Amino acid sequence: MFSFVLVFIVPLSNLLSNEFYKGDALVKEGVYAFYNYDFDKAVQVLDEARGIYPEHPGVHFIWAAARWVRAQANSPVDETYKILENDLQTILPIYDALVLKFDYDPMYKLYRGSAVGLTARVSLGKKQWLRTLYRAYKGFVIINDVAIDYPDLADSQLPIGIVEYYSAISNRLLKFAAGFYDLNPSKDSGLQKISVSADRGTWSWIESKAILSNLYLWVEDEPILAVDYTKSLVQNFPNNFYFNLLYLEDDATAFSSLLASSNI
């Protein structure tokens, strides 16, 4: 549901209980409200966090994404893109400045790439196809550079894993394009990278687990592997209807698989 930009962004996620960046706890509160479908509270909390902790690496991007999703629930489609476009125009100069100030910290570059990539969604909404491709490419290059330079940064593995997985099941042109960026167009490699993000990502574990749940349930036909991921999502976000529905589907399908394999 919330993987609205897939390749182009580092999705929203949980922050660890021990703050690494000042403001982690407040941003976490906003993120949890977001994934529990309390969008008004999420935007309110993230507004506050932006004011108090303007140098937090994720708060500006998460704020823009939360405002866009809230708009999708309450506003006409054209208005949602105007909101997203205006918010991105607001935060991109902020990220440009933060990357310069904290050039030693890859998280700022990662979120800058995410914000640049999200501009592709605005172009897509306007049916500007070439601009969509260009902006998506521009954002992905930034994210891919971070993943290459900082291979231990688990959060960067999600978008790379998505590209590798989907290029493996797509046409030759997409496979060639993935190889051009030194990516491995392989389902196994893609799943492994997404799993790293799900298990170790500070920011990306929520979307990573949701994506793995869908892939194992509907594409890989391995529902048993999906259950643990969806169970974790439901435990953390009990008010998220989509996660609850996904968990029920995973659990029921996994149970049916077990019965079938046992010849019961």
Question: Model segments located where?
Answer:
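Solenoid-like repeat scaffolds
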Residues: 49-54, 149, 179-184, 198-202, ...
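Structural signature of tandem alpha-helical TPR/SEL1-like repeats
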Residues: 186-192, 221-228, 255-260
